[in-house]
């Protein structure tokens, strides 16, 4: 009798808890947060991540992975953690409500609330602020210095005449030493950037009227000894761009162009500076370029990895703009012809890109100037492997097939190999359906996938032979779930082995180690475990450095012999996700280690980050019932520690569950879908049901969905919380019958549920 009483009490208590939970309404959206932008110090001690509200004030949190102590910097965005983990630099936004009120009052941009620079000491917890922030930068690997500029808000005092300023003039640049807290000021700076190591700061100076005694041009500032070195002194009206730096930090190159606002021409010259030069010298001018062409300022120069070559762009000279005519007197006319490669609306969309298009050229440093044009009209995009150090380049061109791209989903292309040493080219493939074209890191091979025969091929640069590298394979490399009226694409490739000895190709489930020369038999890096267990493995690079935009790092790091390789894992049967790992073969053994599972759970894992000097792994984990939160592991997932709880308010609401449903279509195919049910679901009740469908979605069974308005999908948490069922069925399309296919897949699934 006591057992019955206790059971009855627990049931009544559970029901009362469910009944106390509120349904979601539209007022709750702003309280829901998201987490992302994970960064980690090299030794794994400090981890930072950003927490954002849909509308509101977010923050950056700093975690000490050893003590699990957390500190937050309120309203911080764009966080940058120094590699040694000592400092976090971020832009601190104004209060959201303050910005919203300023927008409501329709204030001018210079009257809007300004950002603040925040410099947070991760060791002491001290936060230093510098108001009215306009921008800040740091060397990618730098630990000591940052630079920033501020902009004072407009003076809105009544009756006071605004001070007229030269809009092109530079402003003060502050160079801040993180350890000492001291600041150096550089005047009239319009642009600036650090070297990767952060030891040198390059500034473009453009003095205004108040700084008329200062020289304009490009300068290099060394914060350690406070030395400002002149690289180039510019004339009035010239525009000087920030330099590109060779990987050995010995060479600089930059563009200088005259004032082109009146003529519409973007002619430029390339200047060069290296150790021992008193100042920069002209390297390439338009007189070195063929008639009718000029150096383009729309393509930044780039040094080859060795620093022996420089690559840049040229473009046809455009007609000089007649500045004597008024805009109203200039006739504007768009002419279209039925044999144009693109229809007129697309031509207009592409106009800016076409006007800025340039063609790749190369010149050797230290030799008499010989400009070699690599790109041509027939193949306008040329890629040079080995970080521009290879003696060859390649181009995949649809030049001869652009017209048919308007109606064909399977575009054809030609493949060219270009000799970098003399600019000549060779057509190695004509009229082929190719994709996933890419060169090996050391430039020995070029690989591609043939969409027509579903095979991978390689081009050997040494002997110029093309071989099929996946003949007679027991698996297909074409998308096995492909169901649209076009050729099936491949699953791509993940990485290269050190020395270009292997390329890692993906099939539906496994990763294959393939010899690009075609001589060594293929080896399944994942041992065929994926196909046996129906688990999709993909190489993950949690310790791979993600370089910010603008940093030239063209090749991913190769996988070395004996290296530990991590894989993301997705179980097609259960929809669970996880992480596996193996070790590649050492040179002597010649055999890879067995696959080992770190973890597999009914969850989704995102943003895996591994410290470069320790075994700390930080990641985001979630499923439909559990909001995305930050977790860490120090022992390859044997134990996990949850770090955040960003949406505790979810417990107050009637949430939901996600369940995998299986059925057969009317044409006999096995299908899957997701049924979302309210948390307080009662199987004895009847519920209204919504059906949302779009291709396949069953793989998202363990994916969180924030309550939020959407223009394209339905708000599943909202409807489930308000006691609707939501059914999301997969659809398998049959060619030529999309509507009937959807009907044949969806209706049987709905009938099974009702």
Regions from the PLM with identified roles:
Residues 1-22:
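Bacterial Sec-dependent N-terminal signal peptides
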Residues 19-611, 615-616, 622-628, 632, ...:
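Beta-propeller folds
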Residues 12-16, 529, 723:
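Generic low-complexity, intrinsically disordered sequence content enriched
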Residues 600, 604-754:
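Serine-hydrolase catalytic core recognition
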Residues 13-14, 23, 458, 607, ...:
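Intrinsically disordered, low-complexity peptide-like regions
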């Amino acid at each position: 009798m006591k057992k019955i009483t206790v059971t009855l009490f627990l049931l009544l208590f559970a029901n009362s808890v469910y009944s106390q939970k509120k349904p979601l309404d539209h007022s709750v959206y702003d309280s829901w947060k998201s987490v992302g932008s994970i960064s980690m110090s090299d030794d794994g001690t400090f981890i930072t991540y950003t927490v954002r509200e849909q509308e509101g004030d977010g923050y950056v949190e700093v975690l000490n992975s050893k003590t699990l102590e957390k500190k937050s910097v309120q309203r911080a965005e764009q966080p940058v953690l120094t590699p040694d983990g000592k400092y976090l630099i971020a832009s601190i936004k104004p209060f959201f409500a303050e910005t919203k009120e300023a927008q409501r009052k329709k204030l001018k941009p210079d009257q809007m609330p300004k950002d603040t620079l925040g410099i947070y000491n991760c060791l002491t917890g001290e936060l230093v602020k510098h108001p009215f922030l306009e921008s800040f930068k740091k060397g990618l690997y730098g630990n000591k210095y940052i630079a920033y500029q501020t902009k004072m808000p407009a003076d809105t005092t009544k009756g006071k005449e605004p001070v007229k300023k030269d809009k092109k003039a530079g402003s003060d640049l502050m160079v801040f030493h993180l350890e000492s807290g001291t600041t150096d000021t550089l005047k009239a700076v319009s642009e600036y950037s650090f070297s990767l190591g952060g030891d040198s700061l390059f500034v473009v100076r453009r003095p205004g009227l108040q700084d008329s005694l200062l020289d304009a041009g490009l300068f290099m500032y060394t914060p350690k000894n406070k030395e400002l070195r002149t690289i180039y002194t510019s004339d009035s009206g010239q525009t000087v761009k920030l330099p590109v730096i060779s990987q050995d930090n010995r060479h600089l190159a930059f563009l200088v162009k005259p004032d082109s606002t009146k003529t519409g021409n973007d002619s430029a010259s390339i200047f060069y500076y290296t150790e021992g030069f008193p100042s920069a010298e002209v390297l390439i001018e338009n007189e070195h370029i063929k008639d009718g062409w000029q150096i383009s300022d729309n393509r930044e120069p780039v040094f080859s990895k060795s620093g022996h070559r420089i690559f840049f762009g040229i473009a046809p000279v455009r007609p000089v703009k007649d500045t004597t005519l008024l805009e109203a007197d200039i006739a504007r006319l768009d002419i279209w012809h039925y044999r144009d490669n693109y229809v007129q609306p697309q031509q207009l969309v592409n106009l800016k890109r076409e006007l800025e298009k340039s063609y790749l050229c190369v010149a050797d440093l230290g030799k008499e100037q010989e400009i070699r044009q690599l790109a041509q009209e027939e193949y306008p995009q040329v890629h040079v492997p080995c970080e521009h150090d290879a003696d060859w380049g390649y181009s995949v061109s649809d030049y001869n097939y652009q017209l048919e791209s308007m109606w064909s989903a399977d575009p054809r292309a030609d493949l060219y190999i270009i000799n970098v040493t003399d600019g000549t080219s060779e057509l190695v493939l004509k009229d082929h359906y190719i994709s996933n074209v890419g060169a090996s890191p050391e430039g020995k091979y070029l690989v591609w996938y043939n969409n027509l025969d579903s095979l991978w091929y390689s081009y050997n640069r040494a002997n110029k032979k093309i071989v099929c590298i996946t003949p007679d394979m027991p698996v297909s490399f074409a998308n096995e779930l492909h169901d649209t009226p076009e050729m099936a694409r491949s699953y791509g490739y993940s990485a290269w082995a050190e020395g270009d000895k292997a390329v890692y190709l993906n099939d539906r489930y496994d990763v294959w180690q393939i010899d690009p020369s075609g001589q060594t038999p293929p080896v399944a890096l994942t041992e065929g475990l994926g196909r046996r267990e129906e688990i999709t493995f993909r190489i993950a690079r949690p310790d791979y450095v993600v370089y910010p935009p603008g940093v030239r790092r063209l090749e991913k790091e190769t996988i070395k012999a004996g290296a530990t390789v991590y894989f993301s894992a997705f179980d097609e049967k259960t929809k669970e996700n996880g992480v596996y790992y193996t070790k590649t073969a050492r040179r002597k053994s010649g055999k890879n280690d067995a696959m080992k599972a770190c973890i597999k759970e009914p969850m989704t894992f995102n943003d895996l980050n591994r410290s470069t000097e320790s075994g700390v792994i930080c990641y985001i984990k979630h499923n439909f019932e559990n909001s995305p939160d930050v977790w860490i592991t120090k022992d390859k997932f044997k134990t996990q520690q949850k770090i955040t709880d960003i949406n505790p308010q979810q417990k107050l609401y009637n949430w939901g569950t996600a369940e995998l449903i299986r059925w057969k279509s009317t044409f006999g195919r096995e299908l899957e879908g997701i049924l979302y049910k309210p948390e307080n679901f009662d199987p004895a009740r009847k519920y209204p049901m919504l059906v949302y469908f779009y291709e396949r979605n069953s793989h998202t069974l363990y994916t969180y969905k924030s309550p939020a308005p959407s223009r394209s999908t339905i708000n599943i948490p909202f409807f489930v919380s308000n006691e609707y069922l939501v059914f999301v069925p997969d659809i398998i399309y049959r060619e030529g019958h999309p509507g009937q296919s959807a009907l044949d897949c969806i209706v049987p699934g709905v009938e099974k549920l009702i």
